[in-house]
Amino acid sequence: MNRKLIQNLAETLCRQVKHFNKTETECLIRLFNSLLGEQAERKTTIGVDRAKFRNILHHTFGMTDDMMTDRVCRVIDKDNDGYLSVKEWVEALSVFLRGTLDEKMKYCFEVYDLNGDGYISREEMFQMLKDSLIRQPTEEDPDEGIKDIVEIALKKMDYDHDGRVSYADFEKTVMDENLLLEAFGNCLPDAKSVLAFEQQAFQKHEHCKE
């Protein structure tokens, strides 16, 4: 993709996606093209496949849980075609790198709402938490500890007592206690990963400086 095309695309995207100026958006497009490799030169570019993006989530942003990275990919791949378009890529990084608390809450809730019905149910909490607890083989019911944690989470988050967590419940919980933003699994990069990525993407490239 030549410089003029990148500039035009950056101009369009930075009007549609928050938090990045035109120069930064250009950098992210170049990075996207480098991930595409030879495909970037073709007229019909599909995008970055989920396997490659999962690799970035794992190695660049420290998200190591398979179930979570799969959910993150599904949420970010909005048209569900199995590939990340350049717009989906920039939108994801907008939330990851510079998202407001409100944007991050909406994103995390979507990741945790496994079946997309607008609620986080007991079953969904169990699914997300079951791999995070070390089970003792001697326990009669190895799932008992996870069930206990689910009940504690519901007690803390389910403000309207309907046995599930709505977005309003989740928002109120996180506003009261920010640390509970990623209560059911790591789906955002930590501050160190964000800083390292920004330095790599924006500061080390001359063409990405204003």
From Swiss-Prot:
<feature type="binding site">
    <location>
        <position position="119"/>
    </location>
    <ligand>
        <name>Ca(2+) 2</name>
    </ligand>
</feature>
<keyword id="KW-0106">Calcium</keyword>
<dbReference type="InterPro" id="IPR002048">
    <property type="entry name" value="EF_hand_dom"/>
</dbReference>
<feature type="domain" description="EF-hand 1">
    <location>
        <begin position="64"/>
        <end position="99"/>
    </location>
</feature>
<dbReference type="InterPro" id="IPR028846">
    <property type="entry name" value="Recoverin"/>
</dbReference>
<feature type="binding site">
    <location>
        <position position="77"/>
    </location>
    <ligand>
        <name>Ca(2+) 1</name>
    </ligand>
</feature>
<comment type="function">
    <text>Regulates ciliary motility and is required for cilia-driven determination of body laterality.</text>
</comment>
<dbReference type="GO" id="GO:0009966">
    <property type="term" value="P:regulation of signal transduction"/>
</dbReference>
<dbReference type="GO" id="GO:0036126">
    <property type="term" value="C:sperm flagellum"/>
</dbReference>
<feature type="binding site">
    <location>
        <position position="81"/>
    </location>
    <ligand>
        <name>Ca(2+) 1</name>
    </ligand>
</feature>
<feature type="binding site">
    <location>
        <position position="115"/>
    </location>
    <ligand>
        <name>Ca(2+) 2</name>
    </ligand>
</feature>
<dbReference type="GO" id="GO:0005929">
    <property type="term" value="C:cilium"/>
</dbReference>
<dbReference type="InterPro" id="IPR018247">
    <property type="entry name" value="EF_Hand_1_Ca_BS"/>
</dbReference>
<dbReference type="InterPro" id="IPR011992">
    <property type="entry name" value="EF-hand-dom_pair"/>
</dbReference>
<feature type="binding site">
    <location>
        <position position="83"/>
    </location>
    <ligand>
        <name>Ca(2+) 1</name>
    </ligand>
</feature>
<dbReference type="Pfam" id="PF13202">
    <property type="entry name" value="EF-hand_5"/>
</dbReference>
<keyword id="KW-0969">Cilium</keyword>
<dbReference type="GO" id="GO:0005856">
    <property type="term" value="C:cytoskeleton"/>
</dbReference>
<dbReference type="Pfam" id="PF13499">
    <property type="entry name" value="EF-hand_7"/>
</dbReference>
<keyword id="KW-0677">Repeat</keyword>
<feature type="domain" description="EF-hand 2">
    <location>
        <begin position="100"/>
        <end position="135"/>
    </location>
</feature>
<keyword id="KW-0206">Cytoskeleton</keyword>
<dbReference type="GO" id="GO:0003341">
    <property type="term" value="P:cilium movement"/>
</dbReference>
<feature type="domain" description="EF-hand 3">
    <location>
        <begin position="145"/>
        <end position="180"/>
    </location>
</feature>
<feature type="binding site">
    <location>
        <position position="158"/>
    </location>
    <ligand>
        <name>Ca(2+) 3</name>
    </ligand>
</feature>
<dbReference type="GO" id="GO:0036158">
    <property type="term" value="P:outer dynein arm assembly"/>
</dbReference>
<feature type="binding site">
    <location>
        <position position="169"/>
    </location>
    <ligand>
        <name>Ca(2+) 3</name>
    </ligand>
</feature>
<feature type="binding site">
    <location>
        <position position="79"/>
    </location>
    <ligand>
        <name>Ca(2+) 1</name>
    </ligand>
</feature>
<comment type="subunit">
    <text>Component of the outer dynein arm-docking complex along with ODAD1, ODAD2, ODAD3 and ODAD4.</text>
</comment>
<dbReference type="GO" id="GO:0005509">
    <property type="term" value="F:calcium ion binding"/>
</dbReference>
<keyword id="KW-0963">Cytoplasm</keyword>
<comment type="function">
    <text>Component of the outer dynein arm-docking complex (ODA-DC) that mediates outer dynein arms (ODA) binding onto the doublet microtubule. Seems to regulate the assembly of both ODAs and their axonemal docking complex onto ciliary microtubules. Regulates ciliary and flagellar motility and is required for cilia-driven determination of body laterality.</text>
</comment>
<keyword id="KW-0966">Cell projection</keyword>
<protein>
    <recommendedName>
        <fullName>Calaxin</fullName>
    </recommendedName>
</protein>
<feature type="binding site">
    <location>
        <position position="117"/>
    </location>
    <ligand>
        <name>Ca(2+) 2</name>
    </ligand>
</feature>
<feature type="binding site">
    <location>
        <position position="164"/>
    </location>
    <ligand>
        <name>Ca(2+) 3</name>
    </ligand>
</feature>
<feature type="binding site">
    <location>
        <position position="160"/>
    </location>
    <ligand>
        <name>Ca(2+) 3</name>
    </ligand>
</feature>
<feature type="binding site">
    <location>
        <position position="124"/>
    </location>
    <ligand>
        <name>Ca(2+) 2</name>
    </ligand>
</feature>
<feature type="binding site">
    <location>
        <position position="162"/>
    </location>
    <ligand>
        <name>Ca(2+) 3</name>
    </ligand>
</feature>
<dbReference type="GO" id="GO:0005737">
    <property type="term" value="C:cytoplasm"/>
</dbReference>
<keyword id="KW-0282">Flagellum</keyword>
<feature type="binding site">
    <location>
        <position position="88"/>
    </location>
    <ligand>
        <name>Ca(2+) 1</name>
    </ligand>
</feature>
